[in-house]
Amino acid sequence: MASLPSQSCCYQGFRHSGAPKGTLSMVKDIEVYTSYPPDKSTEYGVLILTDIVGHRFSNAQIIADQFAENGYFVMMPDLFLGDAVPLNKPGEFDMGKWRSGAYHPQGKNHLPETVDPIVEVCLSEMRSKYQCKKIGAVGYCFGGKYVVRHLIPGKMDVGYTAHPSHIDESELKGIKGPLAIAAAAKDNIFPAEKRHVSEEILQEVGFPYQINLYSGVSHGFGVRGDMNAGEVRYAMRSAFVQAVEWFNEYMKEK
C-alpha cells in the first residue's frame, strides 16, 4: 500500500471556532454541503472528500467555505450515508466493523463499491447542473483514497490530499493528473517509508506532483489539529494554502 488503513487517530482531534456559511441539500439520496465564491461563479469547482468525521463536522464546513472564499464553487458530500464517526468518539470502536457496515442501520459498508458511486454522482452534478469547467478534488484521510481513484480525465482534473489513508499502490499508479500531498511528520498511517514509495510512484507516472512534509504535527492536522498550538496552526494554514495554490496553478487558465 502507498498508505495504511484508518486507525483511531482518524477521528480524534479538536473542534475549531467559526460558523459555517454554506448550505446542506440533497443530490439524489446524498446529502451535500455546498459553498459559493463571492462572485457565485461555478466555473471552477472543488469536491471535498472528507475524513471519517464527515461532511457535517463544522471544521470541514469551515474549510469548504475557505476554498469558496478563494474563488471555487465547493461541494462536499456525505460519503458515509449517515454513518460518519463522531469526533473523539468515546468507548470501544472497531474500525474494521465500521468499514464493513456493521454499525450502519442498513448495513451499508464504507468500501469503494459504496463510496465510488457517491463520488461519481457528485462529479456528474458538478459537471452538468453547475457547469464546472474544471474540478479539483481535496481528500482528507479517508477521502484521499477516492481522490486518487478518480483523478482521471472527465472526472477530476487536479488532486490534493492531506494525510491520506488506505491508498493502494496500484491506485496511485493509475492517476492521470497533477497530485499534491500534505504529509505529517508523525503519522503511523502515512509514515516515511510510505511517503518515499509514493514519491517513487509519482515520479514514474509522470504527472506534476508535490509532497510537502510538515514537522511537529500528526495525522489529521489538516482538519482536526490543535489551533492553540503554534506549530500545528502554522502547518494547517500552510497546507490549506498549498492546496489553493496547487489548484490555481493547474486549474485556472493563465
UniProtKB/Swiss-Prot annotation:
The active site is at C141, D187, H219. The keyword Cell wall biogenesis/degradation does not apply. It is an enzyme of class 3 (hydrolase). Signal peptide: none annotated. Its EC number is 3.1.1.-. One of its GO terms (molecular function) is hydrolase activity. Pathway: Secondary metabolite biosynthesis. PANTHER family: DIENELACTONE HYDROLASE (PTHR17630), PROTEIN AIM2 (PTHR17630:SF44). Belongs to the dienelactone hydrolase family. Hydrolase; part of the gene cluster that mediates the biosynthesis of the tropolone class of fungal maleic anhydrides. The pathway begins with the synthesis of 3-methylorcinaldehyde by the non-reducing polyketide synthase (PKS) tropA. 3-methylorcinaldehyde is the substrate for the FAD-dependent monooxygenase tropB to yield a dearomatized hydroxycyclohexadione. The 2-oxoglutarate-dependent dioxygenase tropC then performs the oxidative ring expansion to provide the first tropolone metabolite stipitaldehyde. This is Hydrolase tropI. The lineage of its organism: Eukaryota, Fungi, Dikarya, Ascomycota, Pezizomycotina. The gene is tropI.
